[in-house]
Amino acid sequence: MIPLEIIEVEGIIIDEKPYGETSKILNIITKDKGVIGVLAKGAKRLKSPLRSVSERFCYASFNISYKEDKLSILLSADVINPFSNIKKDIKKVSYLNFLSELTSGVIKQNDDERIYDIYLSAILKIEEGFDPSV
């Protein structure tokens, strides 16, 4: 049996998929662990505390019941930045989707922490109003 480890990790949700009636599976890009697959139980319920912290591109500090190479469980999260300015602009969302796919692919091949730092810096610049097409 794989031992469970409760960890706190800072990351950004790069993908979310529905799971059953009320839950979501999230892919979170992190500095220390690369990309983590996480089950957010009940996150689609209206009154769930995980509802607002389980949206795509949410930058947060996540408390996770971690299982290496398996689906982990999201216990709670504290939002650092929801990147609301990006979510209001379809062009910025498109660029961020592309950047997320690219970063996810690169991090699977090389879990260098600098990749996460560059990704986060790019998102912060886009959030501040930098034109991503430049």
Where do the language-model regions lie?
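Non-catalytic alpha-helical scaffolds and adjoining flexible linkers that form interface surfaces
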Residues: 1-24, 29-134
